[in-house]
């Protein structure tokens, strides 16, 4: 029993613990090599097409660049302006909707946090007012009375 040797399985385990036959492994490898080779050839063709397109387009871009560059800059600025305007519009509608819900008492998300912050701020304002009154009363000379 002590000299019993365990052999390593020659086949990989499948996803459910079943051993896959050698032919299945060969088929998987052949499929992977075929797909990888096809993608490699395709990437080479795309690279060659890009180089050819740049070779043809570069003289045209150089000739028309005094017109194209300002036009592209203008189009880009107009597009960014419209997108920014739309974004600010959506933000404004969202904020106005939230304010409407808050004012009508529908408790939108974050309203309780706003109320807590408002109460804390009001409490601190009262504390500062009280301290200012105490400070003012302490530093008034005894001979002078405040006229109210």
Swiss-Prot record:
Region (Hydrophobic): 29-148
Signal peptide: none
Record flagged with keyword Acetylation: yes
UniProt KW keywords: Acetylation, Lipid droplet, Membrane, Transmembrane, Transmembrane helix
Topology in the lipid bilayer: Multi-pass membrane protein
Record's protein name: Oleosin 1
Polar, as annotated region: 2-28
A biological-process GO annotation: reproductive structure development
GO cellular component terms attached to this protein's record: extracellular region; membrane; monolayer-surrounded lipid storage body
Xref: InterPro entries: Oleosin
Record field: transmembrane: 37-57, 81-101
Gene that specifies this protein: OLE1
Residues where N-acetylalanine is found: 2
Species of provenance: Prunus dulcis
């Amino acid at each position: 029993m002590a000299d019993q040797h365990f052999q390593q399985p020659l086949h990989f385990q499948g996803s459910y613990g079943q051993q896959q036959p050698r032919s299945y492994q060969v088929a998987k490898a052949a499929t992977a090599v075929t797909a990888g080779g096809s993608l490699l050839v395709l990437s080479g063709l795309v690279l060659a097409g890009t180089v050819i397109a740049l070779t043809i387009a570069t003289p045209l871009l150089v000739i028309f660049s005094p017109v194209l560059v300002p036009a592209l800059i203008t189009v880009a600025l107009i597009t960014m302006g419209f997108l920014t305007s739309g974004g600010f519009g959506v933000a404004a509608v969202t904020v106005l909707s939230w304010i409407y819900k808050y004012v009508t008492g529908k408790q939108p998300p974050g309203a309780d946090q706003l109320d807590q912050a408002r109460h804390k701020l009001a409490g601190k304002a009262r504390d500062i007012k009280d301290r200012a009154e105490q400070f003012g009363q302490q530093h008034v000379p005894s001979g002078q009375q405040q006229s109210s």
